[in-house]
Structure formats: C-alpha cells, structure tokens
Swiss-Prot record:
UniProtKB keywords: ATP-binding, Cytoplasm, DNA damage, DNA recombination, DNA repair, DNA-binding, Nucleotide-binding, SOS response
A GO MF term: ATP binding
Main location, first listed in the record: cytoplasm
Lineage: Bacteria, Pseudomonadati, Pseudomonadota, Alphaproteobacteria, Hyphomicrobiales
Reported function: Can catalyze the hydrolysis of ATP in the presence of single-stranded DNA, the ATP-dependent uptake of single-stranded DNA by duplex DNA, and the ATP-dependent hybridization of homologous single-stranded DNAs. It interacts with LexA causing its activation and leading to its autocatalytic cleavage.
Similarity remark: Belongs to the RecA family.
Gene Ontology CC: one annotated term: cytosol
Location of the protein in the cell: Cytoplasm
BP GO annotations: DNA recombination; DNA repair; SOS response
Binding of ATP, residues: 79-86
Protein name stated in the entry: Protein RecA
Keyword Transit peptide assigned: no
One Pfam family, short name: RecA
Length: 363
C-alpha cells in the first residue's frame, strides 16, 4: 500500500494573521503589566553578557566559564566543616568592594570573625552585617535588602542556621519535620524575581548532613530541602584535600572546588588551590599550578622557572619568589588569562562527572 506524501503549503495570509495576533497580544500585555514585561529576545537592546564578580581564585574563575560568579543569580556554596566556604564568600565580597559594590552579610551562625575578614581584604566600614534571631527574620532582612536595588552581593551564612521561629519557641526535642524546607521554599519563591531585577548576587552557604539508611550512592545531602538546589544557578562543592605544613607547623589547607551545577557555562569542572591560615586564597600558589598546566611555567624536577628565569626549588620557595616579585607574578597572571581556554580544557580533563553529579546538577 502506497503511503501518501505530505506536502507543506506556504500560506502568506496565515503568517500575516499570526503576526498581527502576536503584536496584539504583546500590546495587551504591555498595557496591563508595563513596557518591557515581554519582548523578543534578539531584538531591541543588545543581549547583555553575563555580569560576573570574581571569587578571588583565578582557577575557580576559569572553571566557572564566565570569569566569576554571575550577578542577579542565586549561588550555593556547600561542603564539610572548615573547608573554606565562608572564606570563599568573603573573598567574593572583597572583590565586589574593590569595584565599588555594596555588600551585606547575614550572619545567622553568629560566627563572623571581623579580624579574619579584614585580612582577606573586606572593607568592614562599608560591609552591612545582620545577626538575626530567627530564620524568618534573616530571610525578611535578605528580601528587604535585595528589593532596595542597592546591594551587589549578599551572603547568608548559613542555611542550616536559619532556625524557624516555631522551632525556637518550642521545647527541646519537639519533632517538627519540614519547617526549614518550607521556609526556604517560600523565601526563594519571593526572592528569585527581585534578585534578577536588582542584579544582586545572593550566596547561600550550606552545610552537609548524612541521609540515614542509604545503601547505594552518596549518603550526603544539604540542609533546607530541595528548593535551593533548583533555584541556584551555580552550586559549588568545596572540600579540604590536605593540610599544608611548614616543617611540622600547619600553615593552610589545600582545597578542591567542584562546579556541581552551572546554568551559565558547562558544569562539572573542578580546581584545586591553597587557602592559607590568616591570608585566604593563595594567589601565587595558583599562578604556579595554573602556569604549569598552561605550559607558561616550566617545571623541571623540583625547579620552577618562567621565561628562562628560575623561580625556586620546590613549590613553597617558588611561591615566596613570586610574593617578593609582584611584577613577574603579574606577567604570569596576564599570560594565564590570555590562555584561559587552554587552562579550562586542562581543568575539564580532570573532572569526570559521576551519577551523583548528574542527580545534583539536574536540579
């Protein structure tokens, strides 16, 4: 039996009718909700590139694919205790302040160390800080600051410390399941629109908990339910890899950050860098590591060299040389930035997505 062939017939009259109907609908929407409430994406003003703020880590900026964390988005930074979550958030605040941005810190944990923040480059005189009593109060303050349109970066530290009022007023040991998850879900529904309109970056720091009875897959989960996983444009998993020592004295941690979710660039890239006690992210350490990956810094045995000039024997000596010679460090950084694509490819080579990554990143 012969199959009948389908023939597409162009009907210019139908196309004109559709165009008129769309124009009428657009005009009606703009009258009802205001000009700019709906538009054609490719027409009118030029589509803006994603605005970003540096994380303070050159390697992480490259791994994020757009040169930093995107503005007007929700960001989640999570990981085990003492892995560098707050340090990374404070570095982002410091970078925003360098550009003249106004920043706020909602300290739900009541644990911010102003001395350490100042060492990381944070201008405490211009930093707005709040230490709320309840989760509802913290999120109301967050909503008010975001709606003001004057805040560039706002950090909430942490989701786990956003205790609902009902839990605080109740007795110790009372079972009230789902309170925090419902609180976060409602808050994010309200916040997401104003965050986009005000172009404010909101960073939620989160903690890790263990799921009971998990036989297969990772038993780890983050607090506050699933809403934050869905609303976050970028999710960063930060882990301590090792402790750095000078002889027997601990001087810092080597940490690994994995981009678990990224809505503005390819995800699953990971990068390692040093966080030194009392200093924060070691920029000179990153220049050496990224320079070696990009072929800019040569490594021969234990010796590091750049442009036929020896930097030092051993990584710590090379870091000390760059610290004492900022002009050479600046030239290496400029060369790395010129080869960001190559460095990003090298970073991606080391990141093999797992089933857990796809589960978390799909949110």
């Amino acid at each position: 039996m012969a199959q009948s062939s389908l023939r597409l017939v162009e009907n210019p009259t139908m196309d004109k009718d559709k165009s008129k109907a769309i124009d009428a609908a657009l005009a009606q929407i703009e009258r009802a909700f205001g000009k700019g409430s709906i538009m054609r994406l490719g027409k009118g003003d030029k589509v803006q590139e994603v605005e970003t703020i540096s994380t303070g880590s050159l390697g992480l900026d490259i791994a994020l694919g757009v040169g930093g964390l995107p503005r007007g988005r929700v960001i989640e930074i999570y990981g085990p205790e003492s892995s560098g979550k707050t340090t990374l958030a404070l570095h982002t605040i410091a970078e925003a302040q360098k550009k003249g941005g106004v920043c706020a810190f909602v300290d739900a944990e009541h644990a911010l160390d102003p001395v350490y923040a100042r060492k990381l480059g944070v201008n405490l005189d211009d930093l707005l800080i709040s230490q709320p009593d309840t989760g509802e109060q913290a999120l109301e303050i967050t909503d008010t600051l975001v709606r003001s349109g004057a805040i560039d970066v706002l950090v909430v530290d942490s989701v786990a410390a956003l205790t609902p009022r009902a839990e605080i007023e109740g007795e110790m040991g009372d079972q009230q399941p789902g309170l925090q998850a419902r609180l976060m879900s409602q808050a994010l529904r309200k916040l997401t629109g104003s965050i986009s309109r005000s172009n404010c970056m909101v960073i939620f720091i989160n903690q890790i908990r263990m799921k009971i009875g998990v036989m297969y897959g990772s038993p780890e989960t983050t607090t506050g339910g699933n809403a934050l996983k869905f609303y976050a444009s970028v999710r960063l998993d930060i882990r301590r890899v090792s402790t750095l020592k000078d002889r027997d004295e601990p001087i810092g941690n080597s940490v690994r950050v994995k981009v678990v979710k990224n809505k503005v660039a390819p995800p699953f890239k990971q990068v390692e860098f040093d966080i030194m006690f009392g200093e924060g992210v070691s920029k000179v350490g990153e220049l050496i590591d990224l320079g070696v990956k990009a072929g800019i810094v040569e490594k021969s045995g234990a010796w590091f060299s750049y442009d036929s000039q020896r930097l030092g024997q051993g990584r710590e000596n090379a870091k000390g040389f760059l610290r004492d010679n900022p002009d050479i460090a600046g030239r290496i950084e400029a060369a790395i930035r010129q080869n960001m694509g190559l460095v990003a490819d090298k970073i991606l080579e080391n990141a093999v997505p797992t089933a857990e990554d796809y589960d978390e990143g799909a949110a």
